[in-house]
C-alpha cells in the first residue's frame, strides 16, 4: 500500500515537473524554442499585439462629430477582460499543445478554412466585451432579462455565453460546421443562414459582432436584421473592426472582396466612425451608444494573444 502511494506521488510530481519544464514560460523551453525558430522566416509579432493595454480604449472625442460625442461610452480594461488575457497567456505557453495545433492547422488548411480548423481544435476563442461592458453599453443591470437573443456569426459561442444570462431563448447562426458543433455543445439553438429571417417571430436583441467586414452582402444583412428586430424595444449590438478592410474567407483560407461595399471613409478610427451613422441610417438604424474596445483572440506559440481595434455600437430601429 505504501509502495502504491509512493508511486502515485512520484507520478504526480513528475507530471507537475514536466509541465513546469515544458511550458513556453520556462527559460529552458523558451531557449529551445528560440533556437528552433530563429533566423530567416521566423515568426513575426502580431499586428497590434504589443500595444499598451490602455491604448486599446483611447478615443479622441474632438475628432468625432457632435452627434457621436454625445453617445460615446468610455470603456476601460476591467476584470473580465484581464481574466481572458491571463488565460490566453497561459494557453500560449503549453508547448506541445501549440505544436500539435500548428501541425494540424498546416495540414488541414489545404481543405478547411481557418475558422473551421479553430472550431475543430477548440482554440482561437474571441473576446469582444466583458459582462460589465455589455451591461454598460445596453444600460441594463445584472438582473435584467428579456426574451430572445440572436447572435449572428457566433463562432464557438464564447461571446454568446457572456450575453446569454440576460435572455430566455438564445439563437445563433454560423457557417462553419465545426463551430456549429461547438455551439450545439453549449445547447444554443443554431439556425441556418437563410432560416433566421423567416422564423415567424422577432428578436429583442440581435448581435452582429465583427461580421460585416467578413460577409458578402453587409448592407443586405443590416436590412435583414432590421426586418426581424422587435420594432420598439429591440436593439442591435454591432462590432466592427476599424480601419475597415472587408474580405470574405473561402474554403482553403482564400480571401475575396465582398459583392456589396459599405461606404466607410477616413484613414483612422475616429474618421471612419464618423461615416458610420449614414451607413446605419440607410438600413433603418440610429446609434444609441458606442465605445472603443479591443477585439481579442487567443494566442498561439508566437504570440500570447492577438488584438484589433473594435468600434462597438448599440443601434435602435427608426
UniProtKB/Swiss-Prot annotation:
It is found in: Endoplasmic reticulum; Mitochondrion. Changing residue 126 to A: Nearly abolished binding to substrate proteins. Changing residue 151 to A: Abolished binding to S-adenosyl-L-homocysteine. Changing residue 300 to A: Abolished binding to substrate proteins. One of its GO terms (molecular function) is protein-L-histidine N-pros-methyltransferase activity. Changing residue 297 to A: Reduced binding to substrate proteins. It holds the Pfam family DREV. Keywords: Endoplasmic reticulum, Glycoprotein, Methyltransferase, Mitochondrion, Signal, Transferase. GO terms for biological process: methylation. Its main location: endoplasmic reticulum. Changing residue 214 to A: Decreased binding to SLC39A5 substrate. Residues 1-18 form the signal peptide. One of its GO terms (cellular component) is mitochondrion. Belongs to the METTL9 family. Protein-histidine N-methyltransferase that specifically catalyzes 1-methylhistidine (pros-methylhistidine) methylation of target proteins. Specifically methylates the second His of proteins with a His-x-His (HxH) motif (where 'x' is preferably a small amino acid), while exploiting the first one as a recognition signature. Catalyzes methylation of target proteins such as S100A9, NDUFB3, SLC39A5, SLC39A7, ARMC6 and DNAJB12; 1-methylhistidine modification may affect the binding of zinc and other metals to its target proteins. This is Protein-L-histidine N-pros-methyltransferase. The lineage of its organism: Eukaryota, Metazoa, Chordata, Craniata, Vertebrata.
Amino acid at each position: 500500500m505504501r509502495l502504491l502511494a509512493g508511486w502515485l506521488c512520484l507520478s504526480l510530481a513528475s507530471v507537475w515537473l514536466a509541465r513546469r519544464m515544458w511550458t513556453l514560460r520556462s527559460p529552458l523551453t523558451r531557449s529551445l524554442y528560440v533556437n528552433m525558430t530563429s533566423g530567416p522566416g521566423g515568426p513575426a509579432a502580431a499586428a497590434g499585439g504589443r500595444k499598451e493595454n490602455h491604448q486599446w480604449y483611447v478615443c479622441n472625442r474632438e475628432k468625432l462629430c457632435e452627434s457621436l460625442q454625445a453617445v460615446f461610452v468610455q470603456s476601460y480594461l476591467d476584470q473580465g477582460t484581464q481574466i481572458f488575457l491571463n488565460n490566453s497567456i497561459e494557453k500560449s505557453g503549453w508547448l506541445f499543445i501549440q505544436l500539435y495545433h500548428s501541425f494540424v492547422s498546416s495540414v488541414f488548411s489545404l481543405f478547411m478554412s481557418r475558422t473551421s480548423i479553430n472550431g475543430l481544435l477548440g482554440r482561437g476563442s474571441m473576446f469582444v466585451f466583458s459582462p460589465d461592458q455589455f451591461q454598460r453599453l445596453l444600460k441594463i443591470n445584472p438582473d435584467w432579462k428579456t426574451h430572445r437573443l440572436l447572435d449572428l456569426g457566433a463562432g464557438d459561442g464564447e461571446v454568446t455565453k457572456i450575453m446569454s444570462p440576460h435572455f430566455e431563448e438564445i439563437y445563433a447562426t454560423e457557417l462553419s460546421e465545426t463551430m456549429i458543433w461547438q455551439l450545439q455543445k453549449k445547447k444554443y439553438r443554431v439556425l441556418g443562414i437563410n432560416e433566421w429571417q423567416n422564423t415567424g417571430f422577432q428578436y429583442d436583441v440581435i448581435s452582429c459582432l465583427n461580421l460585416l467586414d467578413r460577409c458578402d452582402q453587409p448592407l443586405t444583412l443590416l436590412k435583414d436584421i432590421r426586418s426581424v428586430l422587435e420594432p420598439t424595444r429591440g436593439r442591435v449590438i454591432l462590432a466592427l473592426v476599424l480601419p475597415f478592410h472587408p474580405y470574405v474567407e473561402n474554403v482553403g483560407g482564400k480571401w475575396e472582396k465582398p459583392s456589396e461595399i459599405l461606404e466607410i471613409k477616413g484613414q483612422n478610427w475616429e474618421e471612419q466612425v464618423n461615416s458610420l451613422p449614414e451607413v446605419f441610417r440607410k438600413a433603418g438604424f440610429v446609434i444609441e451608444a458606442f465605445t472603443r474596445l479591443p477585439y481579442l483572440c487567443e494566442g498561439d506559440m508566437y504570440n500570447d494573444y492577438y488584438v484589433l481595434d473594435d468600434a462597438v455600437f448599440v443601434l435602435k430601429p427608426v
